[in-house]
């Protein structure tokens, strides 16, 4: 248990959206809250979570726990991406391309939060279609998970890094 606490302290956590939702029943409406969060270590690990509860703090706590449980690693290249990528989830489409040092994170809303916690410092990004935060986060993570480093490509092709970079 102590290891989880220690691990949790060095993660960046961002709350993207809190939404009030309702369920209509015979006696009226039952309100609850949903929370969308992302966590990352700033060094290529990221996860997102979506929690739902009757109170806002409980929904945030649930989503943070889910985000910590669903983390995975992304190949980064000195604070940017190795190559341009596209991601898609339902109606949301995102495009991200590497940028020179000093550019910063040029992205909007939910996409910016994901890129900040994963550790990307320089990127040009654009979201197309639906800007629903949940779908944008999923599309961004889908795009980031498709990033391949030159070492990964070389290993898959059975070549050296120098031969594929020519």
Swiss-Prot record:
InterPro entries: Ribosomal_Su5_D2-typ_SF, Ribosomal_uS5, Ribosomal_uS5_bac-type, Ribosomal_uS5_C, Ribosomal_uS5_N, Ribosomal_uS5_N_CS, Ribsml_uS5_D2-typ_fold_subgr. GO terms for biological process: translation. Signal peptide: none annotated. Gene3D superfamilies: 3.30.160.20, 3.30.230.10. Disulfide bonds: none annotated. GO terms for molecular function: rRNA binding; structural constituent of ribosome. Residues 11-74 form the S5 DRBM domain. Keywords: Ribonucleoprotein, Ribosomal protein, RNA-binding, rRNA-binding. GO terms for cellular component: small ribosomal subunit. It comes from the Bacteria. The N-terminal domain interacts with the head of the 30S subunit; the C-terminal domain interacts with the body and contacts protein S4. The interaction surface between S4 and S5 is involved in control of translational fidelity. PANTHER family: MITOCHONDRIAL RIBOSOMAL PROTEIN S5 (PTHR48277:SF1). With S4 and S12 plays an important role in translational accuracy. Located at the back of the 30S subunit body where it stabilizes the conformation of the head with respect to the body. Belongs to the universal ribosomal protein uS5 family. Part of the 30S ribosomal subunit. Contacts proteins S4 and S8. NCBIfam families: rpsE_bact. This is Small ribosomal subunit protein uS5. The lineage of its organism: Bacteria, Pseudomonadati, Pseudomonadota, Gammaproteobacteria, Vibrionales.
């Amino acid at each position: 248990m102590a290891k989880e606490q220690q691990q949790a302290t060095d993660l960046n956590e961002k709350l993207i959206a809190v939404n009030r939702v309702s369920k209509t029943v015979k006696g009226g409406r039952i309100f609850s809250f949903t929370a969308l969060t992302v966590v990352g270590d700033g060094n290529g690990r990221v996860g997102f979570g979506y929690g739902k509860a009757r109170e806002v703090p409980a929904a945030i706590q649930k989503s943070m726990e889910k985000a910590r449980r669903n983390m995975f690693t992304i190949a980064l290249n000195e604070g940017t991406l190795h190559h341009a990528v596209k991601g898609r989830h339902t109606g949301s489409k995102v495009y991200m391309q590497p940028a020179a040092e000093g550019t910063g994170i040029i992205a909007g809303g939910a996409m910016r939060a994901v890129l900040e916690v994963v550790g990307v410092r320089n990127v040009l990004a654009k979201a197309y279609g639906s800007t629903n935060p949940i779908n944008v986060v999923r599309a961004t993570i889908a795009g980031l998970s498709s990033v391949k480093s030159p070492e990964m490509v070389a290993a898959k092709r059975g070549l050296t890094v120098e031969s594929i970079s020519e």
